[in-house]
């Protein structure tokens, strides 16, 4: 996170506006501008654990990772700089949360790439902080307004759910496949055998659908789930609870907070970080799996067929096999053997 994103570069064109401001940074924080911008004081709130990791090293306790921001997170701030995410319901959850805490009269800045739909911020905030576009550069828009009225915010109102077979899947804005099971996960699920036993880790668990479906027909599995996303962690916990299933669920940047070894690691790894295509998480998953699999343990992942994972699997484990595929997706399987690179 050394290079600035286009959105941050647009903000830097207005750096003089923030020198005497007490700024809260929030939203899709994909670089370390919150730690580097010259302000009277800076705080940050993020729902993404990997963003928190980067900023925490430079900002300490003034950056917080959680699903919902609290009053202490915006303490004494008079300015919000909000990075618009690609997901509009996610933006609504976060902005209603933050604006319900900031004092009336606060300066509100919203910045984002045009293709992310940042223009819809004007309509979303019209009742609370009418926005004007103050800059357009680097294919981004920067909007400014003042908070005229605090919205009421009820996090419970943002929960959704859908049914998969006999399972109830709980979801929140920002969680992958919020509106139903995606095709890739469906293909991976079709390969999971009933009566699986042992310790299973679901990396990038989303709403917890893979782990819940596995446990529903393999009651002897011991589940561990992790994700970088606070909404995903909370949704997975709620999914397990709704179906009477047990499991350990926590935030982790791939394996950063994972301890121990497992008999199976399953994942539908992301390859989009915000609007950018990123293979880093999936490559870290494959390479790091050797340190978290028992001998004979299995890594099973689903991915878009065009992604270059076979090479990484072969470099790391010595081999791989494709156990299911469609025109768009493949399910890869490999085993922890002595030839795997530890």
Swiss-Prot record:
Subcellular location: Cytoplasm
Segments crossing the lipid bilayer: none
Assigned EC number: 2.1.1.172
GO cellular component term, pick one: cytoplasm
Reaction it catalyzes: guanosine(1207) in 16S rRNA + S-adenosyl-L-methionine = N(2)-methylguanosine(1207) in 16S rRNA + S-adenosyl-L-homocysteine + H(+)
CDD domains linked: AdoMet_MTases
Keyword list, A-Z: Cytoplasm, Methyltransferase, rRNA processing, S-adenosyl-L-methionine, Transferase
Disulfide bonds, paired cysteine numbers: none
Main location: cytoplasm
GO molecular function: 16S rRNA (guanine(1207)-N(2))-methyltransferase activity; nucleic acid binding
One Pfam family in the UniProt entry: MTS
Known partners and oligomeric status: Monomer.
Function statement: Specifically methylates the guanine in position 1207 of 16S rRNA in the 30S particle.
HAMAP family, A to Z: 16SrRNA_methyltr_C
Recorded family membership: Belongs to the methyltransferase superfamily. RsmC family.
Protein name, entry field: Ribosomal RNA small subunit methyltransferase C
Gene responsible for this protein: rsmC
């Amino acid at each position: 996170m050394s290079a600035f994103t286009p959105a941050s570069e647009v903000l830097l064109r207005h750096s003089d506006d923030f020198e005497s401001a007490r700024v809260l940074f929030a939203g899709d924080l994909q670089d370390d501008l919150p730690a580097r911008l010259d302000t009277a004081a800076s705080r940050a709130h993020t729902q993404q654990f990997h963003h928190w990791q980067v900023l925490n090293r430079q900002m300490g306790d003034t950056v917080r990772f959680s699903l919902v921001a609290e009053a202490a997170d915006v303490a004494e701030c008079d300015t919000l700089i909000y990075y618009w995410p690609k997901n509009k319901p996610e933006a609504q959850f976060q902005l209603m949360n933050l604006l319900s805490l900031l004092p009336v009269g606060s300066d509100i800045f919203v910045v984002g790439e045009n293709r992310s739909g940042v223009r819809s911020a004007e309509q979303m905030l019209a009742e609370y902080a009418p926005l004007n576009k103050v800059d357009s550069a680097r294919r981004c828009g920067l909007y400014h307004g003042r908070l005229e009225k605090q919205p009421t915010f009820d996090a419970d109102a943002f929960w959704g759910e859908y049914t998969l077979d006999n399972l109830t899947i709980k979801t929140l804005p920002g969680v992958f496949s919020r509106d139903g099971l995606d095709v890739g996960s469906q293909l991976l699920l079709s390969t999971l055998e009933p009566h699986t036993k042992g310790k299973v880790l679901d990396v990038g668990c989303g709403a917890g659908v893979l782990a819940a479906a596995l446990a529903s027909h393999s009651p002897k599995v011991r589940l561990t789930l992790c994700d970088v996303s606070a909404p995903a962690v909370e949704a997975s916990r709620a999914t397990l609870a709704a179906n009477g299933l047990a499991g350990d669920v926590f935030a982790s940047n791939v394996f950063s907070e994972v301890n121990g070894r497992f008999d199976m690691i399953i994942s539908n790894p992301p390859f989009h970080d915000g609007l950018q295509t990123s293979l880093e998480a999936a490559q870290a998953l494959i390479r790091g799996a050797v340190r978290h699999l028992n001998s004979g343990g299995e890594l099973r992942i689903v991915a878009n067929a065009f992604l270059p994972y076979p090479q990484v699997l072969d470099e790391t484990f010595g081999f791989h096999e494709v156990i299911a595929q469609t025109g768009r997706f493949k399910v890869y399987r490999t085993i922890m053997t002595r030839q795997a690179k530890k």
